[in-house]
Amino acid sequence: MKVRASVKKVCRHCKVVRRKGVVRVICKDARHKQRQG
């Protein structure tokens, strides 16, 4: 899980999702997981 000021899609499988006011990137590649912090 990377914590970043700006989250971006890395590949075509990435999805930007908003959960409880936190912007996240979920992907089938676990290395692409990100959270906005």
Curated annotation (Swiss-Prot):
Swiss-Prot/TrEMBL GO biological process terms: translation
Any single GO CC term annotated in Swiss-Prot or TrEMBL for this entry: ribonucleoprotein complex
GO molecular function annotations of the record: structural constituent of ribosome
Alphabetized UniProt keyword annotations: Ribonucleoprotein, Ribosomal protein
SUPFAM superfamilies from the UniProt entry: Ribosomal protein L36
Pfam family of the protein (one): Ribosomal_L36
Entry annotated with the keyword Ribonucleoprotein: yes
HAMAP family in the record: Ribosomal_bL36 (MF_00251)
Similarity comment: Belongs to the bacterial ribosomal protein bL36 family.
Cross-referenced PANTHER family: 50S RIBOSOMAL PROTEIN L36, CHLOROPLASTIC, LARGE RIBOSOMAL SUBUNIT PROTEIN BL36C
Protein's name in the database: Large ribosomal subunit protein bL36
